[in-house]
UniProtKB/Swiss-Prot annotation:
ATP binds at F8, S9, G10, G11, Q12, D13, S14, T15, T16, C17, L18. Gene3D superfamilies: HUPs. Its EC number is 6.3.4.20. The keyword Zinc applies. The keyword Metal-binding applies. Pfam families: QueC. This is 7-cyano-7-deazaguanine synthase. Pathway: Purine metabolism; 7-cyano-7-deazaguanine biosynthesis.
Length: 231
């Protein structure tokens, strides 16, 4: 039996990854992390979506220690969420230092316990916004280190790594989940489900991608299939 663990926040990217994983694996587990994030609604959203999409199990892990160590606008009400991210010269204040290091490591430990062959994460380098832990070289390096440390061959899969946001919408549509991803996921930095607040960086990226996909469906779908190898 093929098993996978999805690092699952209930946002657009991880929900799209879960939708795909349900078609590619016999059994899919979801892991969501409570790190004292500013908008706790995402945990409830993740729980509902994991159930709706048929995850075998959904585990919420308490990693609130990260909140004490990592100062970010996503963990501190006193730090305002910017409408737009800074350019590639700087790291945005929405970056939570060490988050993906911790999440992927703990997801791999969970994968070890449930005998899963893969950990799936929705990080993406194409829409890189200054987050160093979304880079392909980081994921591969951590994957290598984790496998050495556990003497186990667990793959870190990044289905969205080389596709842009419009193509991510196309991927959700390919798996028949465009409406669910649009209406029921929570990507907004201000904690508003669906289309979100409409002005934070996450909402801008999401909306621009959706508009581009809806205006160029055939071309974007073709590009997505070419990049992902789907037919």
């Amino acid at each position: 039996m093929k098993r996978a663990v999805v690092v699952f926040s209930g946002g657009q990217d991880s929900t799209t990854c879960l939708a795909q994983a349900r078609h590619q694996y016999d059994e899919v587990h979801c892991v969501t992390f409570d790190y004292g994030q500013r908008h706790r609604a995402e945990i409830d959203v993740a729980r509902d979506l994991a159930l709706k999409l048929g995850a075998r199990a959904h585990k919420v892990l308490d990693v609130t220690l990260l909140n004490e160590l990592a100062v970010s606008s996503l963990t501190r009400d006193s730090i305002p969420v910017p409408d737009y991210e800074p350019n590639a010269d700087g790291i945005p204040n929405t970056f939570v230092p060490g988050r993906n290091i911790l999440f992927l490591t703990l997801a791999a430990i969970y994968a070890y316990q449930v005998k899963a062959e893969a950990v799936i994460t929705g990080v993406c380098e194409t829409d890189f916004s200054g987050y160093p832990d979304c880079r392909d070289e980081f994921v591969k390096a951590l994957n290598h280190a984790v496998n050495l440390g556990m003497a186990k061959d667990i793959r870190f899969e990044t289905p969205l790594m080389w596709i842009d946001k419009a193509e991510t919408w196309a991927l959700a549509d390919y798996w028949g989940q465009l409406d669910l991803v649009r209406e029921e996921t929570l990507t907004c930095y201000n904690g508003i489900k669906g289309d979100g607040c409409g002005h934070c960086a996450a909402c801008n990226l999401r909306a621009n991608g959706l508009n581009h996909y809806l205006s160029n469906k055939a071309a974007v779908m073709t590009a997505m299939k070419q990049k992902t190898g789907l037919r």
